[in-house]
C-alpha cells in the first residue's frame, strides 16, 4: 500500500494559491486514477483505490499547512504504512515555477508543512516531490506570495509541473524512488 500526500490549506480562499500546489497534484492523481476524495477522517480528506494492482491512498490534510503531520501520522498508523511507502508533494520557493525536485530525505528547508510532518513522523527520511513556485519579486512578503494565486503567465508551467508530479507518482508505484529521482531531476 502506498500513501501520497499533497500539502496545502483547506478552504475556498486558498484554492489555486501557490501554497496549495500539493493539493492540486493530488486532485490530478484522483482524476487520473478515478479515486474519489470523499473520506473525512484523520483531520484530512482522502480516498483509496487500486492502480496497476497497487493499493493507493491519496490524502489532503485539512489541518492547515503548519499542522500537516497531525493528519499524516494517524493515517499512516491506522493503515500501517511504512515511511518508505509514503511520498509528500509540496510547494518550494527555491525551485522555479514549472520545475520539480525529488528527494529521498532531508530537512524541512523552512517549509512548515514539512517541518510538522518530520516532527510527527520522528524522521526526515521520507520521499518528497518539491514543486517549484519561485521566490517573490519586488520585495513582496513571502507569506503574501505563497498565499497568492499564480499569474496567468505562470499557469502553463504550473499545469506542466502538476502533470510531471503525477507522472512521477505513477512511476513510483512500479519503480524505486531513487530511479524516478534520476529521471525527473534531470
Curated annotation (Swiss-Prot):
<feature type="site" description="Discriminates between blocked and unblocked aminoacyl-tRNA">
    <location>
        <position position="9"/>
    </location>
</feature>
<dbReference type="GO" id="GO:0005737">
    <property type="term" value="C:cytoplasm"/>
</dbReference>
<keyword id="KW-0378">Hydrolase</keyword>
<dbReference type="InterPro" id="IPR036416">
    <property type="entry name" value="Pept_tRNA_hydro_sf"/>
</dbReference>
<feature type="binding site">
    <location>
        <position position="66"/>
    </location>
    <ligand>
        <name>tRNA</name>
    </ligand>
</feature>
<feature type="site" description="Stabilizes the basic form of H active site to accept a proton">
    <location>
        <position position="91"/>
    </location>
</feature>
<feature type="binding site">
    <location>
        <position position="64"/>
    </location>
    <ligand>
        <name>tRNA</name>
    </ligand>
</feature>
<feature type="binding site">
    <location>
        <position position="112"/>
    </location>
    <ligand>
        <name>tRNA</name>
    </ligand>
</feature>
<dbReference type="GO" id="GO:0000049">
    <property type="term" value="F:tRNA binding"/>
</dbReference>
<feature type="binding site">
    <location>
        <position position="14"/>
    </location>
    <ligand>
        <name>tRNA</name>
    </ligand>
</feature>
<comment type="subunit">
    <text>Monomer.</text>
</comment>
<dbReference type="Pfam" id="PF01195">
    <property type="entry name" value="Pept_tRNA_hydro"/>
</dbReference>
<dbReference type="GO" id="GO:0072344">
    <property type="term" value="P:rescue of stalled ribosome"/>
</dbReference>
<keyword id="KW-0963">Cytoplasm</keyword>
<dbReference type="InterPro" id="IPR001328">
    <property type="entry name" value="Pept_tRNA_hydro"/>
</dbReference>
<protein>
    <recommendedName>
        <fullName>Peptidyl-tRNA hydrolase</fullName>
        <ecNumber>3.1.1.29</ecNumber>
    </recommendedName>
</protein>
<dbReference type="InterPro" id="IPR018171">
    <property type="entry name" value="Pept_tRNA_hydro_CS"/>
</dbReference>
<comment type="function">
    <text>Catalyzes the release of premature peptidyl moieties from peptidyl-tRNA molecules trapped in stalled 50S ribosomal subunits, and thus maintains levels of free tRNAs and 50S ribosomes.</text>
</comment>
<dbReference type="GO" id="GO:0006515">
    <property type="term" value="P:protein quality control for misfolded or incompletely synthesized proteins"/>
</dbReference>
<feature type="active site" description="Proton acceptor">
    <location>
        <position position="19"/>
    </location>
</feature>
<dbReference type="GO" id="GO:0004045">
    <property type="term" value="F:peptidyl-tRNA hydrolase activity"/>
</dbReference>
<comment type="function">
    <text>Hydrolyzes ribosome-free peptidyl-tRNAs (with 1 or more amino acids incorporated), which drop off the ribosome during protein synthesis, or as a result of ribosome stalling.</text>
</comment>
<keyword id="KW-0694">RNA-binding</keyword>
<comment type="similarity">
    <text>Belongs to the PTH family.</text>
</comment>
<keyword id="KW-0820">tRNA-binding</keyword>
